[in-house]
Amino acid sequence: IFDRHRELIDEPCASILNDERAKAIIRFKATGFPNRKDEDWLHTDVAKKFATDYGMNLGRVATAIHGTFTCDVPNLNTYHAYIINDSFQAGENKGKQLPQGVMLGSINDIAADSRDLIGPYYNRLATNGDSIVQFNTAFTQDCLVLYIPRNTVVEDTIQIVTLLQANVDMMSNRRLLIILEENSRASLLLCDHSSLQKQTLSTQVTEIFVGRGASLDLYEIEETSGSNTRLGQLFVRQEQDSRFRHSNITLTNGFTRNRVEVSLEGEGAETHINGLAIGDKEQHIDNRTLVDHKVPRCTSNELYKYILDEQSTGVFAGKMLIRPDAQHSVSEQTNRNLCLTSCAHMYAQPQLEIYADDVKCSHGSTVGQLDGNALFYMQQRGIPAEEARHLLMYAFAGEVIDNIQIEALRDRLHILVEKRFRGELNRCKGCSLCKQ
């Protein structure tokens, strides 16, 4: 496909995309798609997901944004933009403006005037990514760019709605590049939706650069359909005294694999990574993390929780790497999981590699069921069995949701998670969910 349609792929794109594309396709052809012989893919068979005859919007046919997909969060002021399939579209922000110097748009527009600004960042973290990253780089035709200059605070949450929308089986290759310069601050909400029951596959590569003293809060919420496959990879580089907080919430999905790699490259950098995955039916949710402590006096904290019902499958593999020069590192990783049926499966692989001697690190993983004694106690006091189950599940999930810093989003997620447990949120209905 690539060789046959190379001219069509290149034509609408900035030269920076085409330059990296040429190198990526060589790396991809050398390895091909991963398979289950690779330990990193042992529990996630991705090769068969690419066997479907997907359409790709190589001709860049525009798709209109409908008001249904505003994805409003009550009581939260946001600045909207969209990625429809894999193309950036500006939102209708009714007179709202981003602070001076902030850029949010398509790399094909921004690179025309600011190639020197984007050049040092695009594909710099993802260059050595796996073959899925190389595939994404080879076929990407657009990239959302968010650039925040030094000493700039973006008060409103920037909300990006990603939507898969087509009348045929569709593949999209999304790309995001986020740059925060020194002492800047922002919060970003990514809402991932699909509005159709066709087979869909999305690869998504996000590169984030958090400059010295800068702070970024990133929230990702997936509400897609059972026919959707999502393969997401997030790369983060942090400089001195920077802070990065990331929460990934999977409410509804089909087949999901997320990988987060954080490189702590400046002393005093701090990262917090949280995840909540709720699965039922035959859903598959795979989360993998790597936090690389390269320098002294950095802090990392991870908390991932899974609630798996029916025949769903969960995978968690988290690695903390403490390099020889990373003395006085503090790192904690926690993974807790509930399997509600004997047919649900959870695979957990916490890892800790320490090559420094003056550090404080811990990690642990548990897999269990709902507390039978607690269920009995609640039923003895008149709470119906199903309601008691929901209350215990809700309390279990609450620890992750409570780590979200934005109050309005935290409140909204409490409601959505409760609906999910009650079976009221069992498939994606588009962003109109957020208005219910």
Which residues does each predicted region cover?
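N-terminal amphipathic, basic helical "cap/leader" segment at the start of enzyme domains
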Residues: 1-134, 303, 309
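Conserved beta-strand/loop scaffold segments within soluble protein domains that form the structured core
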Residues: 100, 107-376, 380-383, 397-436
